[in-house]
């Protein structure tokens, strides 16, 4: 069964990059052309890199590793939480607290505190033995911990790899992973730095449908890895057929998009078709609180 098709990538807008004035020259090799002032990403390369990332994730999970899903921008929050939960993986979709990886011991203590508060159950009323003020404080603490660390509830150790939507916004998460030697799988938009990612997937990291589709692909790889892990425990090596289908008939304008562009020594060739990408990347915050802020 195919993981994703060329048509799905096109329909989800994965090929739309940023405006030409907002680009990283290191991404030039992933750019197909330029139209209406925006860059168009080469989806043939995207398919190739999806295959590589898929096999890596599947193999990592099959060997017992976990994948941390990271995406705190509005367009990715729902997909990150939904897909990570579906395959039983940890996730961060509210806010990345500095030290979540590099200071995991402290984060783990806060996770234990969150579970303690949840075990207390309903703190309303005096039956629990707390005053109204104490009850209010405990509920606030529980709510704050749940929002920031709820997705890490069952994470007992550092992840084997992380999946990131928007490496520029999640630069602290990427930096921490690199310091610890944790592989990074990520969507690479035309304004990103490919040198920061171990398993890049060239694509649109701003559109909701694009982030959702690519996160589903990673979740599917995790699911296949879990099946393989289970098969090994039973003495078999189950490997579901998984690949990328590119032979589905395409519309004329889609075939035209995939035609070889004219080579240029400078920037990708210009054209005047296709609509301009409207999803702008949210302004990233200049500050990230420390892990201790969750206390």
From Swiss-Prot:
Classification via InterPro entries = Ribosomal_uS2, Ribosomal_uS2_bac/mit/plastid, Ribosomal_uS2_CS, Ribosomal_uS2_flav_dom_sf
Gene Ontology molecular function: structural constituent of ribosome
Q: Which domain of life is it from?
A: Bacteria
Question: Which keywords does the record carry?
Answer: Ribonucleoprotein, Ribosomal protein
Enumerate the Gene Ontology biological process terms.
translation
Biased composition regions of type Basic and acidic residues, renumbered to the chain:
252-287
**Gene Ontology annotations for the cellular component aspect, listed alphabetically:** cytosolic small ribosomal subunit
Region entry Disordered: which residue ranges? Answer: 232-295
Write down a Pfam family by its short name.
Answer: Ribosomal_S2
Mind telling me which PANTHER family this protein's record contains? 30S RIBOSOMAL PROTEIN S2 PROKARYOTIC AND ORGANELLAR (PTHR12534), SMALL RIBOSOMAL SUBUNIT PROTEIN US2M (PTHR12534:SF0)
Query: What HAMAP family does the record tag this protein with?
Result: Ribosomal_uS2_B
The text of the family note is: Belongs to the universal ribosomal protein uS2 family.
State the name under which the record lists this protein: Small ribosomal subunit protein uS2
Species: Salinispora tropica (strain ATCC BAA-916 / DSM 44818 / JCM 13857 / NBRC 105044 / CNB-440)
């Amino acid at each position: 069964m195919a993981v994703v098709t060329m048509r799905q990538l096109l329909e989800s807008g994965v090929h739309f990059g940023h405006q030409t004035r907002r680009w990283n020259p290191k991404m030039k090799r992933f750019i197909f052309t330029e139209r209406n002032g925006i860059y168009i990403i080469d989806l043939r390369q995207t398919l190739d890199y999806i295959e590589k990332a898929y096999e890596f994730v599947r193999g990592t999970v099959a060997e017992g590793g976990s994948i941390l899903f990271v995406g705190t921008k509005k367009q990715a929050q729902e997909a990150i939480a939904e897909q990570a939960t579906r395959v039983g993986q940890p996730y961060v979709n509210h806010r990345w607290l500095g030290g979540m990886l590099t200071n995991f011991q402290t984060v783990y203590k806060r996770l234990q505190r969150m579970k303690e508060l949840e075990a207390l159950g309903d703190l309303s009323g005096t039956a629990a033995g707390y005053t109204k003020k104490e009850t209010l404080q405990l509920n606030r603490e529980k709510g704050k911990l749940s929002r920031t660390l709820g997705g890490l509830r069952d994470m007992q150790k550092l992840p084997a790899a992380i999946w990131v939507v928007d490496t520029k916004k999640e630069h602290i998460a990427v930096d921490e992973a690199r310091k610890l030697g944790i592989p990074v799988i990520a969507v690479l938009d035309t304004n990103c730095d490919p040198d920061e990612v171990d398993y890049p997937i060239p694509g649109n990291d701003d559109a909701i449908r694009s982030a959702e589709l690519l996160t589903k692909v990673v979740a599917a790889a995790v699911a296949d890895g879990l099946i393989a892990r289970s098969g090994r425990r039973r003495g078999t090596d189950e490997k579901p057929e998984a690949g990328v289908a590119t032979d589905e008939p395409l519309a004329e304008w889609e075939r035209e998009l995939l035609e070889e562009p004219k080579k240029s020594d400078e920037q990708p060739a210009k054209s005047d078709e296709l609509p301009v990408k409207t999803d702008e990347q949210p302004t990233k915050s200049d500050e990230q609180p420390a892990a201790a802020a969750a206390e």
